[in-house]
Design a protein with these regions (language model features):
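Short beta-strand element of the alpha/beta-hydrolase
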Residues: 120-132
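Short beta-strand/loop motif that positions the catalytic acidic residue
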Residues: 352-355, 359
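Accessory cap/linker subdomain of secreted extracellular hydrolases
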Residues: 57-61, 244-344
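C-terminal catalytic histidine-bearing segment of alpha/beta-hydrolase fold enzymes
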Residues: 329, 334-337, 361, 368-428
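C-terminal motif of bacterial Sec signal peptides marking the signal peptidase cleavage site
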Residues: 33-35
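Catalytic-loop region of hydrolases
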Residues: 37-117, 375, 426-428
Length: 428
C-alpha cells in the first residue's frame, strides 16, 4: 500500500477543487469553468442509442486535432462518484476515431484519492471498464458503475492510486460505440491518460492500465498500441482479467462450443452488440436481415438499452444462438473478430492476466491461448489462474495478486513474468 496521510473524511468537492485550481494551469481553469451539464439531448435518429445524456457530452465547436486534450470537466454526482475519492470529476477530452483516424470527443471520469499526494504526484491508474452496452446512457460516467466495479475501484483508491476511467468512443458521446474493436479501445484509454496528465492534477508520470472483459481487451490493446500511438507515455504495467482473445483458433471465442448453441445463455447477448459493430465495418450490412423474428425485439433493446436489460430480454424471450438467426451470422461475426484482433502481441510492458476457471463469457481456452501466444511473442506475462472464480469473480478475486504486481510496477522492479510455468496448465 502506498503511504498516505489520509484525511478522516471525504472533503467537499468545492474545497478540494479550489486547491486543485491553484495548482492548475489556465487551460485547466478554463476547462473547469466551461463544463456544464445542461439538459439531456434528444435521441438522434441517425445513430441508434445516441442521446439521452446531458449536453456536457457533446462538443459544439471544432475539435482540436491534438489527441489527449482536456476539453472540459465538472463534478460527478454522488451516485456517479466513488466514496474513497476526495475528487470525483467528469471529463471530456479529444481522441482519435478508431476507423477514420479523425478527431473525436470521448468522455470519462477522474477520481483523486483522499490525503496528500506523495512526491512526484498521485500514482495514476487508467481503468478500462467491461461491456455495458452501446447506447450513450450506458456510459459509466453517466450511468454509474456496478457494485463489483465500485468495490474494485474503491479498493485501489483506498490504496492511494488516482484513477482515470474512459467511457470509450461512442459511449456518452455522439456516434456508434465500436464494441470490441481494439484500436478505439486503446486510443480512448491512452488519450484519457494524456488528458489528465497534461491538466496538472498532480499525477505521476508512471501509469498502470487495468481492465476487465472488454476492458481487459482494452488494457492489453494499450500495451501493444502504446509504442506507435502514445510513445511518450510511461506505462509501467497492465492488469487484465476476463480478457477476450479474438485471434483464438476457431469460433470458441465468439460462440462457445457447439453444444451451447441450443442453450439460453445471457452471454450470447454480446452477439447483438457485435452486429452493431458489423454495421460500422460494413455500412451495407443490415442486422435484421440475419435475425429471426423472435430475436428482433432483443436486438432493438440492444440498440438503446444497457447490458443487463439486453441479457434479461434475451433470457425472457428464450433466445439461443440457433433460434436467433434466420441467416448464419458467422461470416459477419468472423469479420468483426478479425477487426478486433491486436495488430501485434509484442509489448515491452509487463502484463498481469487473471483468468477465472469458471469463465464462460471469455472462454478459458481462449484466455489461455492469449497467454501462450503473448509469451511466445516474448511478452513478460504474469498469469494467475483462479479455478473457482467465474468471469466477474476474477475482478476482485485477483486483488491479492494484482495489488502486489502493481506495487512492483510502480516501484520500477523488473518483472520477468511466469511464462515458463504456464505450459503445465491445461485448458478445460
Amino acid at each position: 500500500m502506498i503511504g498516505l496521510n489520509r484525511s478522516s473524511h471525504v472533503k467537499g468537492f468545492g474545497e478540494v477543487m479550489m486547491h486543485s485550481l491553484v495548482r492548475s494551469s489556465a487551460v485547466l481553469l478554463l476547462a473547469l469553468l466551461t463544463g456544464c451539464s445542461g439538459t439531456p439531448q434528444a435521441t438522434s435518429e441517425a445513430v441508434p442509442g445516441d442521446g439521452g445524456v446531458p449536453g456536457f457530452y457533446t462538443w459544439a465547436g471544432d475539435l482540436p486535432s491534438r489527441p489527449g486534450q482536456l476539453l472540459r470537466s465538472e463534478p460527478l454526482t454522488p451516485q456517479q462518484g466513488l466514496k474513497n475519492a476526495a475528487l470525483n470529476i467528469r471529463i471530456l477530452y479529444t481522441s482519435t476515431e478508431g476507423r477514420s483516424n479523425g478527431p473525436i470527443g470521448v468522455s470519462g471520469a477522474l477520481f483523486i484519492p483522499e490525503g496528500t499526494p506523495p512526491k512526484g504526484g498521485w500514482p495514476l491508474m487508467a481503468w478500462a471498464h467491461g461491456t455495458v452496452g452501446s447506447a450513450d446512457v450506458c456510459a459509466p460516467s453517466f450511468a454509474g458503475r456496478s457494485g463489483r466495479d465500485t468495490r474494485y475501484l474503491n479498493e485501489w483508491l483506498g490504496r492511494g492510486y488516482a484513477i482515470v476511467a474512459t467511457d470509450y468512443e461512442g459511449l456518452g458521446t455522439p456516434g456508434l460505440h465500436p464494441f470490441g474493436l481494439s484500436s478505439p479501445l486503446a486510443y480512448g484509454v491512452l488519450d484519457s491518460i494524456r488528458a489528465v496528465q497534461r491538466a496538472n492534477f498532480n499525477l505521476s508520470s508512471r501509469v498502470v492500465v487495468f481492465g476487465q472483459s472488454q476492458g481487459g481487451r482494452a488494457a492489453f490493446a494499450t500495451a501493444v498500441y502504446k509504442k506507435t500511438y502514445a510513445p511518450e507515455l510511461n506505462i509501467v504495467g497492465v492488469v487484465a482479467t476476463g480478457t477476450p482473445y479474438p485471434m483464438a483458433s476457431g469460433h470458441a471465442g465468439i460462440f462457445g462450443q457447439d453444444t451451447s448453441r441450443d442453450q439460453v445463455t445471457p452471454s450470447l447477448a454480446y452477439n447483438l452488440l457485435r452486429l452493431s459493430t458489423a454495421g460500422l465495418i460494413n455500412p451495407s450490412f443490415v442486422a435484421t436481415d440475419h435475425l429471426s423474428d423472435r430475436a428482433k425485439p432483443a436486438f432493438e433493446v440492444s440498440q438503446r438499452g444497457c447490458l443487463h436489460a439486453i441479457e434479461r430480454k434475451f433470457v425472457a424471450d428464450g433466445l439461443t444462438f440457433n433460434n436467433s438467426f434466420r441467416r448464419s451470422p458467422e461470416a459477419v461475426l468472423d469479420q468483426v473478430n478479425r477487426e478486433s484482433s491486436y495488430p501485434t502481441l509484442t509489448s515491452d510492458i509487463p502484463i498481469f492476466i487473471g483468468t477465472g476457471g469458471k469463465d464462460v463469457v471469455s472462454p478459458v481456452r481462449s484466455q489461455i491461448a492469449l497467454v501462450k501466444d503473448a509469451c511466445a511473442a516474448g511478452d513478460r506475462v504474469e498469469w494467475h489462474y483462479y479455478p473457482q472464480l467465474d468471469h466477474s469473480g476474477a475482478v476482485n478475486g485477483s486483488l491479492p495478486d494484482s495489488t502486489r504486481f502493481v506495487e512492483k510496477a510502480f516501484s520500477g522492479e523488473f518483472m520477468a513474468g511466469n511464462c515458463g510455468a504456464i505450459g503445465a496448465i491445461r485448458p478445460r
